[in-house]
């Protein structure tokens, strides 16, 4: 008990110990977010007459700027590990706000799902997202798939907190890679309006999809955001977790490449780089389930998964290189 108590005190001491060389300005990742914010704000202004909620989008961005500045001031007043963690945590908690925002920006563009579904058919000779859940219907398998999908944000938090507590010198650059990756994907989603099977199959007609017919739905999703009923064991705990998350934040956007697969692949790279076998192999099963689940629950085409893998490799290599320039390891 004495040893445990001593460890707890040591952790608390490190959390609130004033840093000798506190960071003076915004973090690199905060600059990235401000850049994304400015770029998308300009897009809202240029498409103001076509956008559905332009005032709310601009006001939301203004509040994010104020919140970012406020967290910077808190850190400057008390420059310690805890306030730095708070700065990062705030930006992480804002991701669910940024995600549906991509739909508000890309809904004015013509939908491209018919091209992706047709390419999927050419590549695989079928629609894996349509057949996967039909082929394996057992409740246990369904729950495994939904557990994998529901593990998305817990996996991000796990890797982030591991670096914070055990690799603090690399925490800043790790969060730069994770958060910047998100905003790279968001930028892609804005200019590549693909909704994925859960939306396109309903709009095009499941019978058409089963017969290999993929009609162009044009701007259908500009005014429609209803998805198919998610396949799987609907009474399952993890099924309900995913269903609840989709009900609150899902939109017909962000299908290609799969950011779920892309981000978790980047997490695997970071877990490997952490030199912790326990972390890497501990999250590996959930990573595999994630890659399968995106197709099983019809959130993505199979080619979206492939796109997630390829994009993750490219993004990680580029950001890892940039880290050496703008996020040096803090000694």
Question: At which residue positions do the language-model features occur?
Answer:
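N-terminal transmembrane-helix/juxtamembrane module of multi-pass inner/ER membrane proteins
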Residues: 3-64, 82-86, 90-156
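Hydrophobic cores of alpha-helical transmembrane segments in multi-pass inner/ER membrane proteins
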Residues: 3-9, 64-76, 154-159, 312-314, ...
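Membrane-embedded catalytic cores of phosphoryl/pyrophosphoryl-handling enzymes
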Residues: 27, 235-331
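Hydrophobic alpha-helical transmembrane segments
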Residues: 63-67, 148-160, 255-267
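Membrane-interfacial catalytic/cofactor-binding modules of polytopic membrane enzymes
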Residues: 191-273
């Amino acid at each position: 008990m004495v040893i445990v108590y001593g460890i707890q005190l040591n952790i608390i001491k490190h959390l609130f110990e004033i840093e000798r060389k506190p960071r003076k300005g915004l973090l690199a990742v905060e600059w990235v977010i401000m850049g994304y914010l400015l770029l998308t704000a300009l897009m809202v202004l240029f498409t103001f007459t076509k956008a559905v909620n332009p005032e709310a989008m601009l006001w939301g961005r203004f509040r994010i700027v104020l919140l970012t500045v406020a967290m910077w001031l808190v850190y400057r007043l008390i420059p310690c590990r805890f306030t730095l963690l708070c700065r990062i945590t705030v930006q992480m908690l804002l991701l669910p706000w940024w995600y549906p925002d991509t739909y508000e920006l890309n809904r004015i563009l013509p939908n491209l799902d018919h091209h992706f579904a047709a390419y999927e058919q050419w590549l695989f000779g079928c629609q894996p997202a349509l057949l996967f859940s039909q082929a394996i219907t057992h409740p246990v398998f369904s729950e495994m798939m939904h557990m994998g999908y529901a593990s998305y944000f817990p996996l991000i938090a796990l890797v982030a907190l591991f670096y914070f507590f055990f690799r603090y010198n690399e925490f800043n650059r790790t969060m730069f890679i994770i958060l910047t990756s998100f905003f790279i994907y968001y930028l892609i989603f804005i200019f590549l309006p693909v909704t994925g099977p859960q939306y396109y199959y309903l709009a095009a007609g499941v019978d058409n999809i089963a017969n290999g017919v993929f009609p162009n739905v044009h701007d259908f999703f500009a005014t429609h955001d209803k998805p198919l009923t998610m396949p799987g064991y609907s009474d399952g705990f993890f099924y309900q977790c995913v269903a609840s998350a989709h009900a609150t934040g899902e939109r017909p956007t962000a299908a290609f490449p799969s950011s779920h697969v892309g981000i978790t692949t980047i997490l695997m790279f970071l877990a490997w780089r952490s030199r912790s076998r326990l972390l890497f192999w501990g999250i590996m099963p959930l990573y595999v389930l994630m890659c399968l689940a995106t197709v099983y629950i019809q959130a993505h085409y199979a080619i979206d998964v492939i796109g997630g893998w390829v994009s993750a490799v490219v993004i990680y290599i580029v950001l890892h290189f940039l880290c050496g320039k703008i996020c040096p390891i803090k000694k």
